[in-house]
UniProtKB/Swiss-Prot annotation:
Organism, as annotated: Drosophila yakuba
Stored NCBIfam families: moaD
GO molecular function: molybdopterin synthase activity; nucleotide binding
Upper taxonomic lineage: Eukaryota, Metazoa, Ecdysozoa, Arthropoda, Hexapoda
Name of the protein in question: Molybdopterin synthase sulfur carrier subunit
Pathway: Cofactor biosynthesis; molybdopterin biosynthesis
Entry's localization field: Cytoplasm
PANTHER family, sorted: MOLYBDOPTERIN SYNTHASE SULFUR CARRIER SUBUNIT
Top-level lineage group: Eukaryota
Length: 90
C-alpha cells in the first residue's frame, strides 16, 4: 500500500461476527484511492481485530463482492465497504 498517495474516506459496514469483533456496526476509514484486495484485507484485519475470522471474510465494495484478492480496488470519497463473515445456519 502506498501511504504517500491520495487517500479517501470510506464507510465500512460490519456484519455478524465481524461486527462483534470490531465492536461497532460501522466505521469510517481513510484508504488509498487504489489498493489490492489482499492489502485491503490485511489492513482491515489489523485495524479492526478480525484475525479470528480472517480466512473466512467476504468483502464487498459498493455492494459488489470482491472475488479475487489480486484485484485492484479503486476507491472514491464516500464509497462503501462491507465486511461479511460466512453466515451459519441450519
Amino acid at each position: 500500500m502506498n501511504a504517500d498517495g491520495p487517500v479517501v474516506n470510506v464507510h465500512v459496514l460490519f456484519f455478524a461476527k465481524s461486527r462483534e469483533l470490531a465492536n461497532t456496526p460501522r466505521s469510517k476509514v481513510d484508504l488509498p484511492t487504489e489498493i489490492t484486495a489482499s492489502d485491503l484485507l490485511e489492513l482491515l484485519v489489523s485495524k479492526f481485530g478480525l484475525t479470528p475470522i480472517r480466512d473466512n471474510l467476504i468483502l464487498a465494495h459498493n455492494e459488489s463482492y470482491i472475488d479475487n484478492l489480486s484485484e485492484r480496488i479503486l476507491f472514491k470519497e464516500g464509497d462503501e465497504l462491507a465486511i461479511i463473515p460466512p453466515l451459519s445456519g441450519g
